[in-house]
């Protein structure tokens, strides 16, 4: 079910308890002393997973045109693995996947690792045609699968780098107790996506996301770079801290403080009515 939905090879596709455990299982098989490129202000569990290992860590600052920063650093020629969130949890920035495909052509030995927790379930994805060599994600976010489950996929290039068969990773992942009910929840969520036409659901989500991006920009509540980038996720950081957060919570709008702003997001089940309600509340003094 997972391999079919995500366009991955069944033998290279794994159910995991969550992203943090899965990513650590996978990178524990990597050769030591590899040069890893990470982003500053990246999802902490992704960063710590590599910092806990015997790797050489290199970081570049987070910036609106992050692709330029990545390209400049890779040009030095010493990076073995680029690891990043496909969608940034703290800003909603969506990495340009076409840019990553171009990187793979120019740096054929580069391994690209993606945290897909804020991506899978929110965008159509085919792993085998993507530039990624490892993608891991928890199921509780956009996959709507509840807690205790996740998915991980690896490429043939990743298998070549670890010089082990996929069974070695399988044995790591399934070592010890596994929550069968949580796995069933993940399967249920994926089957529900398929039943209701996932591509159609994503089209609905994309439409409301585009409307929200434009309207929130019109009232000056999101940074200008969000509109300037070719593609953005459905996660937005609204300007304003405690006051905005309290106002939204009071009006039954789910949100969370994030940095110097407030994070909101839209999924396929949100409607224009939801967006209009949000805008009405935000425009009130």
Please describe what each predicted stretch is:
Residues 1-3, 8-34, 43-46:
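Conserved beta-loop-alpha segment that forms the PLP phosphate-binding cup at the N-terminus of a helix
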Residues 17-20, 38-55, 63-70:
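Substrate-binding/gating loop at the entrance of the active-site cleft, primarily
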Residues 65-117:
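Active-site phosphate-binding strand-loop segment of PLP-dependent enzymes
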Residues 128-165:
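Active-site PLP attachment segment
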Residues 171-213:
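Structural signature of PLP-dependent enzymes
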Residues 206, 210, 218-251, 258, ...:
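Conserved PLP-binding catalytic core of the aspartate aminotransferase-like
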Residues 247-285:
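PLP-dependent enzyme catalytic core of the Aspartate aminotransferase-like
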């Amino acid at each position: 079910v997972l391999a079919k939905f995500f366009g991955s090879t069944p033998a290279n596709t794994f159910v995991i308890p969550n992203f943090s455990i899965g990513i650590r299982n996978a990178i524990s098989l990597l050769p030591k002393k590899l040069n890893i490129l990470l982003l500053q202000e990246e999802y902490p569990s992704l960063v710590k997973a590599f910092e806990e290992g015997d790797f050489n860590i290199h970081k570049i600052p987070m910036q609106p045109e992050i692709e330029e920063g990545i390209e400049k650093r890779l040009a030095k020629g010493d990076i073995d693995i680029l690891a990043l969130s496909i969608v940034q949890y703290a800003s909603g920035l969506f990495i340009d996947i076409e840019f990553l495909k171009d990187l793979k052509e120019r740096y054929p030995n580069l391994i690209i690792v993606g945290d897909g927790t804020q991506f899978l379930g929110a965008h159509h994805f085919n792993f085998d045609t993507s530039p990624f060599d490892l993608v891991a994600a928890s199921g509780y976010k956009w996959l709507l699968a509840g807690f205790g489950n996740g998915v991980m996929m690896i490429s043939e290039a990743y298998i070549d780098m670890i010089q082990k068969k996929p069974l070695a990773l399988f044995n790591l992942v399934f070592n010890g107790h596994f929550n069968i009910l949580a796995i069933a929840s993940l399967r249920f969520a994926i089957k529900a996506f398929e039943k209701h036409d996932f591509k159609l659901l994503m089209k609905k989500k994309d439409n409301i996301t585009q409307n929200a991006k434009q309207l929130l920009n019109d009232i000056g509540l999101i940074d200008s770079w969000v509109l300037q980038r070719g593609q953005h996720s459905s996660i937005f950081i609204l300007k304003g801290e405690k006051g905005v957060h309290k106002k939204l919570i009071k009006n039954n709008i789910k949100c969370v403080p994030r940095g110097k702003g407030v994070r909101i997001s839209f999924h396929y089940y949100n409607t224009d009515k939801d967006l209009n309600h949000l805008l009405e509340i935000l425009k009130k003094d």
